[in-house]
């Protein structure tokens, strides 16, 4: 008999039920349904306040009807014209609107001014100043010029004193020319011409002969007696500068003990150079006409014969 067929496989177990979808709120379900249906979302606008504000507005704003406040005024031409508010308004309206720029140029492109011109380029050039006269260019003086002092007239000149002025005390008395010893008439003229000196000033040197003559003269020519002792007691002694006083003869200078002597010219033949006879020289070796053989340092076949030396 044939074997029985195998039993059929058991039936598969029933499939597990799918998990239930989570409960959704009404707002989320509506948004999800709109996304699933393909509805376009509304584009969001972002107000970025981090950009710099230039010209009174935020960067990115367009001002089509308002004039650019950051633009520089036009450069003045040869014919000066005063800028007015109406002219600026007309120029701003006639100027075509430029596309808005971002960053620092949002208010408009600034114009660079030339070097050397003032910042207020719109101001009209001032009229040239009139030339200043030469009289105004001179600086004002603090005081009027003083008139030059006229030279003194001969009548107002002081009279020339007949006597010599007194010698100042700070300087030593100059040497006065003394009269010669053998001329007695010149002695009385000295007291009359020279006034009495102050007590602290030394008297000028006088020769001995005039002093003796003045003592023999009357007392009217002599100086006051009250001043004489003061002059001699307080005046220092100065060396006499006058040639009239005979000075002591200077002793002759004693002869020096050192006397120059002429040395004889002699030749010292035996001092530096010595010239001697040939007999003092050593005896030279006798000359032998025999050829000598010297041994080389690198070796030679010639034997060394010491008897030949």
From Swiss-Prot:
Pfam family, one: WH2
Residue ranges of the region described as Disordered: 1-273
Transmembrane segments: none
Residue span, WH2 domain: 27-44
Subcellular localization(s) per the UniProt record: Cytoplasm, Cytoskeleton
Compositionally biased region (Polar residues): 82-91
Keyword Cytoplasm: yes
InterPro entries membership: WH2_dom
Assembly with partners or alone: Interacts with wsp1. Interacts with myo1 (via SH3 domain). Interacts with actin monomers.
Role according to the record: Involved in cytoskeletal organization and cellular growth. May exert its effects on the cytoskeleton directly, or indirectly via proline-binding proteins such as profilin or proteins possessing SH3 domains. Plays a role in actin patch assembly by enhancing the ability of myo1 to stimulate actin polymerization by the Arp2/3 complex.
Name recorded for this polypeptide: Verprolin
